[in-house]
From Swiss-Prot:
Organism listed in the record: Rattus norvegicus
Catalytic activity: Ca(2+)(in) = Ca(2+)(out); K(+)(in) = K(+)(out); Na(+)(in) = Na(+)(out)
Record gene name: Chrna6
Protein name: Neuronal acetylcholine receptor subunit alpha-6
Source lineage: Eukaryota, Metazoa, Chordata, Craniata, Vertebrata
GO molecular function, one term: acetylcholine-gated monoatomic cation-selective channel activity
InterPro entries, per the entry: Neur_chan_lig-bd (IPR006202), Neur_chan_lig-bd_sf (IPR036734), Neur_channel (IPR006201), Neuro-gated_channel_TM_sf (IPR036719), Neuro_actylchol_rec (IPR038050), Neurotrans-gated_channel_TM (IPR006029), Neurotransmitter_ion_chnl_CS (IPR018000), Nicotinic_acetylcholine_rcpt (IPR002394)
Modification type Phosphoserine: residues: S401
Subunit structure: Neuronal AChR is composed of two different types of subunits: alpha and non-alpha (beta). CHRNA6/alpha-6 subunit can be combined to CHRNB2/beta-2 and CHRNA4/alpha-4 to give rise to functional receptors. Interacts with LYPD6.
Length: 493
């Protein structure tokens, strides 16, 4: 049994060894065939000669562009950086073979430096090499069709239109063409009308809206020949979320703080300080913007227009605030309020703005209580009523005809009247003179206080007027500025 089992195992091992040897022999033969094919194709091959049988015939090169990443858009230097795959397809009649003669080999991967290839370059390259490096291999088919798809990183020049920054759209182009061969020697044909974006990685700041390719035949001033190029136009749109959150919204809040200046009471003494603080904040934002946008004097970006508008807005608020404070601290000794000013700012504008002075209610209440003593000085009426009993108490020895009738103002009973109609000792006369002096001082003080209150109320009315004016200008100015990109893009589309 053991002897029989050993013979069967030996037969199985021998069969496996024979199969492996045959497979190895076949693979070795295939490698030999590929090596022989490669040697046969490139034994007398000249990579500097165009692959055409007739010198007058052009080499037809099919070209296609595939984008994998929009790496960066540099607005300051006006450069667009892209990761691309450049697909070239052409036919070389010198590199054809019969697959049946080489064990069915239909394709070869050959180094790109060993074959003739079109010198396609990026015309508007800004940094780096203009031509694609030939370090990658090309796919060669048995019928002579060569497909070469080298990857490349290009930094192309792109004129930036920052009028609507950060809600802007840019149109950047990539112009490819042969640098030395004209149309009679190389004829470029575009594969498809769009850029291949199947392997594209989305960019966090820019969105590719459209990427179309066009073929152009151009005659340059330097030469008589016509040159063919293929230009791809990338229509990209900026995603404004970053700038909206970190730049525009803070600017909006700061600009609306300017409106609160006119709601701040003049007595607090911080109105001008608030205005200057807002102006300094906007200046800092303006310095930040100048580092992110290209230096150009052709246009002013939208954010720059808004900051300029807001800075003018804040500057005017400082001027108005100084004017309001000047009105607020005026006195009868320095200024006299004209009648038309009193009419406009103490009667007309308050009624339009639905403002009502608390002093008016006090006057109405005093007038209802005592119509006979209704005057513009309720405080002095109270003073007279408070002082009259004391005066009568001091003058009890005076003649009855000289008594001061209760309920009448002291200002209507001057000391001269008392002196002429009564007899009293000198000490009582001194008391009456003192009371008259105090009453006159109180009257002058009340008149001064009333004029000062009128100036303060006028300052309050001016503040309220400019509060509404600045609210309207701020809202409509902001909406008008930020509607420009929408209207501009609608018109362009």
């Amino acid at each position: 049994m053991l002897n029989g089992w050993g013979r069967g195992d030996l037969r199985s091992g021998l069969c496996l060894w024979i199969c492996g040897f045959l497979a190895f022999f076949k693979g070795s033969r295939g490698c030999v065939s590929e090596e022989q094919l490669f040697h046969t194709l490139f034994a007398h091959y000249n990579r500097f000669i165009r692959p055409v049988e007739n010198v007058s015939d052009p080499v037809t090169v099919h070209f296609e562009l595939a984008i994998t990443q929009l790496a960066n858009v540099d607005e300051v230097n006006q450069i667009m950086e892209t990761n691309l795959w450049l697909r070239h397809v052409w036919k070389d009649y010198r590199l054809c073979w019969d697959p049946t003669e080489y064990d069915g080999i239909e394709t070869l991967r050959v180094p790109a430096d060993n074959i003739w290839k079109p010198d396609i370059v990026l015309y508007n390259n800004a940094v780096g090499d203009f031509q694609v490096e030939g370090k990658t291999k090309a796919l060669l088919k048995y019928d002579g069709v060569i497909t070469w798809t080298p990857p490349a990183i290009f930094k192309s020049s792109c004129p930036m239109d920052i009028t609507f920054f950060p809600f802007d759209h840019q149109n950047c182009s990539l112009k490819f063409g042969s640098w030395t061969y004209d149309k009679a020697e190389i004829d470029l044909l575009i594969i498809g009308s769009k850029v291949d974006m199947n392997d594209f990685w989305e960019n966090s700041e820019w969105e590719i809206v459209d990427a179309s390719g066009y073929k152009h035949d151009i005659k340059y001033n330097c030469c008589e020949e016509i040159y063919t190029d293929i230009t791809y136009s990338f229509y990209i749109r900026r995603l404004p979320m970053f700038y909206t959150i970190n730049l525009i919204i803070p600017c909006l809040f700061i600009s609306f703080l300017t409106v609160l200046v006119f709601y701040l009471p003049s007595d607090c003494g911080e109105k001008v300080t608030l205005c200057i603080s807002v102006l300094l904040s906007l200046t800092v934002f303006l310095l930040v913007i100048t580092e992110t946008i290209p230096s150009t004097s052709l246009v002013i970006p939208l954010v720059g227009e808004y900051l300029l508008f807001t800075m003018i807005f804040v500057t005017l608020s400082i001027v108005v605030t100084v004017f309001v404070l000047n009105i607020h601290y005026r006195t009868p000794a320095t200024h006299t309020m004209p009648k038309w000013v009193k009419t406009m700012f103490l009667q007309v504008f308050p009624s339009i703005l639905m403002m009502r002075r608390p002093l008016d209610k006090t006057k109405e209440m005093d007038g209802v209580k005592d119509p006979k003593t209704h005057t513009k000085r309720p405080a002095k009426v109270k003073f007279t009523h408070r002082k009259e009993p004391k005066l009568l108490k001091e003058c009890r020895h005076c003649h009855k005809s000289s008594e001061i009738a209760p309920g009448k103002r002291l200002s209507q009973q001057p000391a001269q009247w008392v002196t002429e109609n009564s007899e009293h000792p000198p000490d009582v006369e001194d008391v009456i003179d003192s009371v008259q002096f105090i009453a006159e001082n109180m009257k002058s003080h009340n008149e001064t206080k009333e004029v000062e209150d009128d100036w303060k109320y006028m300052a309050m009315v001016v503040d309220r007027v400019f509060l509404w004016v600045f609210i309207i200008v701020c809202v409509f100015g902001t909406v008008g500025l930020f509607l420009q990109p929408l209207l501009g893009n609608t018109g362009a589309s």
